[in-house]
Amino acid sequence: MRTFLFMVLCAVLSGASSDSQQTDIETLMDNVVVLKVPVFMGSMVHVPLTCGGAFQNEAVFWKKNGQAFDPPLMGNQVQVLVEEMKGGNYTCHLSPSGEYLNHTMILIQLNPDNRTVILENGEGGHIHCSAPNYKGSFHCRWRRTQRRSDASVVLVKAERYMEDIPCELDANGSGVECQNTLCSYKEEQHRISLTVYIRSHARLEAYTKSFYLREIVRPAKLPNLHIIDGNVFKWDYPESWEKPCTFFGLQFEIKLVHSGHSCNSENQIMVITNYTVSIQPKKYIFCVRAQDKFTRGPWSHWSQCT
């Protein structure tokens, strides 16, 4: 008898736990619902779906990922049971094989969302951002893990101090170009926040990057690097860099490496601060790169000359 009562009590508590998950249903965007479930497995949540007000008096049939329910799920307003990570795309139709009317994508996000598996976590985090100058345009990129190479971006949100920043997703889905309307001469008071929502099947993960523009400004490679009189090297400021150059100054790092070595080689000969060398250039590679003189942000990529 006690065993039976214990089993009944467990069943009641399990049902209560499942019903309590209703509060974790959030709308991410039109036609996309996010179900936040605990990290531990075993969750079961009833999710209400509506085909649409225009179909109130229609004989609506539902499908999940293109497959009809058995027995059929009918009605303009229905409830579906989502177990663990088994979300999907729920579509409504005029008949079992009839016209498509509407859909709701149910995605699952673990709560807390700290077990990320979709994007690679490299040096500096999952998202890497850079800007060529202070005009407000910046680009952020990411890399999917090998096992989640089919993952797709659902939504990108960028904002600064409650003001939305427009962004456009790259064609390959591995980056985004954003444009913030910022005066180049104005000191930044608030950070930019970028959140990328990306899904693999029904699993949703959110990745956030927060930064000041001055932290990610990386000058372009220095153009027109050339040698004069055999030992004097000259170059120009990048065309994309801010003007006047007296206000947006650059400082330079200069390096000589053995011929055949990369500018990133640790086998450097010397690091110097003038532009004249007294050695035979053909035996060495002259490398130079730049960074913002005042913020000391990221260095540009190396330019080189032999």
Language-model region placement:
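Solvent-exposed loop segments of extracellular immunoglobulin-like
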Residues: 53-64, 138, 149-159, 245-260
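Short beta-strand segments within Ig-like beta-sandwich modules, predominantly Fibronectin type-III
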Residues: 64-76, 167-177, 262-272
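Beta-strand-rich modules
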Residues: 85-99, 181-207, 274-298
